[in-house]
Amino acid sequence: MQPAAIGQLTLFPWGKGAMRFAEGIEDRSHELNLLTPTSQAASFTVDGPFHAIGLALLPLGWAALTGLSACEYSNRLLPASDWLDGAEQIGAELAEKYRDGNISGEECGHALAAYAADRMSPPNRRHMELIDQVTKWLGTSLYPPVEQLYSLTSYSRRQTQRLCERYFGLCPQALARKYRALRAAMLLNSPDLPEAAAAHIADSFYDQSHMIREIRHFTGRTPTRFAGADTEILREVLHRRNLREVQVGLPDDLIAGDGASGDGQENS
């Protein structure tokens, strides 16, 4: 199960698979793929052995690399060659070198990063400022009020909504729901989460059943089902280092000491 996430540029040198999205769409994998930003959890099946190497693309990176609307192209697994020049060639070259043992996974990742960096074309300055404002707004709490965002931007409410959909894939209200659920799942999966922090997380939802529904919608699992052996990959995906685009959203005195810190935003 793949939780709702930011976009990815991913190489699959070994194995093939398919992703099934909530809209009933099923996309088969390719050697080099664009996994577009997703608005809810999606299931996947693979014929292994299956290896995946790639880049997570923050909203600014997604826009700069692809130029695609994160909303119009959400919830898809697309061949990168349909959108990126030279993708088919570099995908085939890296996959062959990896299968032959001539390049490591880390080296593949660096090669993909260099390929992507050469093709980046950032949006205009005001749009970049809005992306930064939305990101910081999400980090102010687990479920920040939308009115707070509207007061931060230099755009009208409708323009802010439209640009948020373009770069983040969802309107502000839905985006806040997504990151509340993802961060709640990440924090509740932490073995040494303080009781006060757990209570604070619960208070950001209407009640326990609402929290369970929201976490299931965006991660594909309920909080009680993160402990099974079949969820090892899911738990890794929901690790703090893989939710780097926003701060944790907890008050400083409730932050757990296991790396789930709220002391700043990681960039990539």
Question: How should these model regions be labeled?
Answer:
Residues 1-147, 152-157, 170-171, 188-189, ...:
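Alpha-helical bundle regulatory/interaction domains
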